[in-house]
């Protein structure tokens, strides 16, 4: 594995952004979360991705959260910045603002709502890559964006030097194989779906960008480590215990359930989210609580 691949591999946390009851970012809590994940053995953190509520933070807030996350990490764990937008100009602005932030790379989502063609996706990511030297990880999540970036488009983008990988969140693990075949073995593929993450690693993915990781960091780190070492029996044992959690953390829109779960476990002080997201429905809370118990976290 190349040095770059090892930087973006293993158990990567799609980190929540803790907030107080007024909707302000709780930076003291964020610092504790960073320490928690370093101690648990997580391999990298994604700051202000989907799970970090990037859509309801201003550009200035996004940049501040990323910079503070880098500051708290003190070089002990790579920080990947969520830097995507559905306007190419906005994504470029965000990416340029991160130039000297100390991040290891950027995670950039397929433009959402406006539903670009495959050529539009290619030109979007090409323009972003050309504005920076930072490594770029593409993010394909059709259930969120309304558009699916095809493996052939990914392969075209893989020819651009600083586009180094993709977070693939279609739940179709056969995509892992096809992207590797078309883009080459050195192109990083990361699963973006906890429930199929282990299967993705078996098929050649370098790791998982995980929501479950927020509340089961050590288990996810161990599972990925075992799987990448080829010890699938031990990896399967952990994954089976977490499977109910993998599913129930999406029982309402992410990051609603995972924020409640992190609050329930005392990892954050409040389950608060910014509107239009609201806290986990009271009638759903016992179900997520049961999943935490099955996982051995309660």
From Swiss-Prot:
Record site feature (Part of a proton relay during catalysis), residues: 50, 113
Chief subcellular location: cytoplasm
Keywords: Amino-acid biosynthesis, Cytoplasm, Diaminopimelate biosynthesis, Lyase, Lysine biosynthesis, Schiff base
GO (cellular component) term, any one: cytosol
Record-listed pyruvate binding positions: 51, 209
Keyword Amino-acid biosynthesis in annotation: yes
GO biological process terms held by the UniProt record: diaminopimelate biosynthetic process; lysine biosynthetic process via diaminopimelate
EC number: 4.3.3.7
Catalytic reactions on record: L-aspartate 4-semialdehyde + pyruvate = (2S,4S)-4-hydroxy-2,3,4,5-tetrahydrodipicolinate + H2O + H(+)
MF annotations from Gene Ontology: 4-hydroxy-tetrahydrodipicolinate synthase activity
Family note: Belongs to the DapA family.
Matches recorded under HAMAP family: DapA (MF_00418)
Protein name: 4-hydroxy-tetrahydrodipicolinate synthase
Source species: Haemophilus influenzae (strain ATCC 51907 / DSM 11121 / KW20 / Rd)
Taxonomic lineage from the root: Bacteria, Pseudomonadati, Pseudomonadota, Gammaproteobacteria, Pasteurellales
Underlying gene: dapA
